Amino acid sequence: MDPVASAGRTSRGRVLLVFPPAFFRLASGHLPNTGMEMPYTFPPLGLLYLGTILGRAGFEVEVIDFAGETYQAERLVAAARRADLVGFSVVRNNRDKVTALIDELVAAGVERPIIVGGPDVTLRPVLFAHTLATVVGEAELTIVDIVERILTGGDLAQAHGILFRDPATGQERTGRPPKLPAELDDIPVPDRDLCDRDHYSLFGPRQRGKTAVVITSRGCPFRCSFCSRIALTQNTYRVRSPENVLAELEALHRAGYRFLFFGDNNFLIDRKRVLAIADGIIARGFAFRIVVAGRVDAADPELFARLRQAGVFLLSMGLESGVQGSLDFLNKGTTVERNGRAVRLAHQAGLFVHANFILGCADETEADLLATRRFVLELPLDSIFVNVLSYQYGSALWAEAHDRGLIADGELNTTATSEHGLARLPEARLRRALKDLLLRFFFRPSYWLRLAMKSARSGEYDFMRLVARLCVQYLYAEVGNTLRKKATQWKARIPRRHEERA
């Protein structure tokens, strides 16, 4: 980069922040050709936080979210040429895209310092080819210093939370330890105008421009053995005050947002705080429709009723299994009975209830798969996601399996199957069990009748439309997988037929 290019500007420099194309798999268990890919439906909140902080510090910031809009190489290259520095956000399922986009810039002859950051490289910091640095950890307290040092040629070894390539030697070096924001109330509310809000909607095109993500806490005090998220937050749990949260919600309401997704790992941990936020929403007359996630420990008729009054219509819970031994293996700290009670209480309060389930825990048998299936089908659940257990880098399960020599250093996401020595049941059986559970759950006439009646009672039809759309897309994906498999088998038989004729 030519330092003269920034001369005469009133800003401290121009920064481009990019979220590459990314999808998450619905009901896949990370097994190939299982489930379907779904696009991200929310703006990149992490980049918006950092972009806001950089903007307040005097930098000109542009954010491009290619997960929310169609990727255009020309737009990326043009924006990078306007910038003094380019940053990419790395999550588990866009790492290859990040590499491809960086290669795109290099091929176009764009010579700008490139940095990456995000949860994937926080868990396992690495330097990407053609990049100068990797930002590690929550960067609200460090990003301004890092960008300033890069643009002015400062000493990166003195920056916090950074892995960088020494310009003089080309060697990898680390800076000082990351800084974790202790007081979340001190972090400015993200400027959502940095992204085009019309790209995002959880409930289809009718609600575009009205959907926002809000984070009211970071981390989690629980220690589920399969979860790697606690490693991202250095095993801490921090919260924003109800007053701080309500101030953000008031600004969102004035701006016309009506659908909120509370992205906390567990919004319901602190009952007193949750009730204060709910009461504040009710008192201010906010007309939000809200999605939250929480553990079954918080199940309480009064709490659920108050949340419903505040506009919460969908509650997501991680039930994981209908087998107590599997819950203990996952270190959930709950019981099958408590899980069932939580679902019934939420249903009675008029909440739509979504639950996540995991198949393939170490000692699960055929009988256990059937027990989980019975448990799922007996509950008044409104939607489910099902996955096969994955040993993810950063989780306690991964560390234990790695210590036992069952997972190699480079295996960051290993599916629990008998082939990997991590479960009793083979991949093929777990794949069938996953598909069977989804089909039995979603394609019951009684399920759709109950969901329709619940929607009519609440006047909330968007959720049922979303589920219907996902079911159609799932069937389409499964039909496509089947046809591709048949085509491959057919092509494989063609040479043999020619040989037989010869």
Describe the predicted segments one by one.
Residues 14, 84-85, 261:
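Structural motif
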Residues 2-12, 21-30, 156-159, 165-216:
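N-terminal [4Fe-4S]-dependent radical SAM core
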Residues 29-45:
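Glycine- and acidic-residue-enriched helix-capping/strand-helix junction motifs
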Residues 46-181, 388-394:
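Glycine-rich beta-alpha loop elements in corrinoid/cobalamin-binding modules
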Residues 24-29, 123-126, 222, 272, ...:
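Flexible glycine/acidic-rich beta-alpha junction loops that bind and position SAM and/or redox cofactors
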Residues 126-144, 304, 309-315, 371-386:
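Structural recognition of alpha->loop->beta junctions
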Residues 1-17, 55, 59-60, 396-402, ...:
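Radical SAM enzyme core and accessory elements
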Residues 190-354, 361, 374:
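Radical SAM [4Fe-4S] cluster-binding motif and immediate context
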